[in-house]
Regions:
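Hydrophobic residues embedded in beta-strands of well-ordered beta-sheets
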Residues: 38, 61-62, 137
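Hydrophobic residues on conserved beta-strands that form the core of alpha/beta folds
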Residues: 51, 72-73, 150
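Acidic Ser/Thr/Pro-rich low-complexity disordered segments
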Residues: 18-21, 44-45, 91-93, 144-146, ...
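N-terminal extracellular ligand-recognition/capping segment immediately after the signal peptide
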Residues: 1, 17, 26-38, 42-54, ...
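Trimeric beta-solenoid/beta-helix "fiber body" segments of extracellular/virion adhesins
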Residues: 35, 42, 68, 86, ...
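Extracellular repeat-rich scaffold modules on cell surfaces
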Residues: 1-27, 58-130, 157-222
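Self-maturation zones of extracellular/virion spikes and adhesins
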Residues: 38-48, 54-58, 142, 146, ...
Length: 222
């Protein structure tokens, strides 16, 4: 079919992920998230990439249940709120948020007490994007040295804003935060860890911009 897919409630589950993604993406068909949940089946070592356009309808809250080790390359637009539910171990986001004015919530759902990585394949450049970290989510960049720009960052206790690099000691990672001019509170911890964890450390730097208030309540160690 040639029109958009509008999801207003319930869950739309794709078991044949490859064909479903092609149906949305190959012809530029758009998925309009307007209150429902989009879910993708996952098999071990199944590295999925989703690139179909996504519009998040104004005044709605919608959810995407992401597959582990997947990559989101969609153009995201709209004014609603979108939640990404990420299972152990990680999920990559390499999307354009230039036309998105809502809030992106990232909910890490760990297994056996572990944390979940939410990261860009290279570095973040989303000066309007407001990100809220929930669950046990780490936010970082996969490339070794990264200059990240994010509109705003909030988060629960137990979340982390880390540095960059998968497994390189001595990385340099900067976070420029505040371009959305919104008031945000981050209860998590900002540290010098690489995305692999405390076994590899580098230098994480913070630059606050914009007119909003950014409250940091955690025991930050960067």
């Amino acid at each position: 079919y040639t029109g958009s897919t509008i999801l207003k409630g319930g869950t739309l589950l794709f078991k044949d992920v490859e064909n479903a993604s092609k149906a949305f993406g190959s012809l530029g068909k758009k998925v309009v998230m307007s209150g429902g949940t989009l879910q993708f089946s996952y098999k071990k070592d199944d590295k999925q990439t989703h690139s179909f356009p996504i519009e998040v309808a104004e005044g709605t809250s919608s959810t995407i249940k992401c597959p582990s080790h997947g990559t989101l390359k969609s153009v995201i637009s709209g004014n609603g709120d979108l939640t990404l539910v990420i299972p152990y171990l990680r999920y990559y986001v390499n999307s354009s948020f230039a036309d998105f004015d809502g809030q992106l919530t990232v909910n890490g759902v760990p297994s056996e007490g572990s944390n979940v990585l939410f990261m860009n394949e290279s570095q973040f450049n989303s000066p309007k994007l407001r990100v809220n970290l929930t669950g046990k989510t780490w936010m970082g960049a996969w490339t070794t040295h990264a200059n990240n720009v994010v509109g705003g960052i909030s988060g629960e206790k137990g979340s982390y804003l880390v540095g960059s690099s998968k497994n390189t000691k001595g990385f340099k990672c900067s976070w420029t935060v505040g371009g959305a001019n919104s008031d945000e509170t981050f209860h998590g911890i900002i540290n010098d860890w690489a995305t692999i964890g405390k076994s590899k450390t580098g230098t994480t730097s913070i630059t606050k911009v914009g007119t909003g208030l950014w409250r940091l309540t955690g025991a930050n160690t960067y």
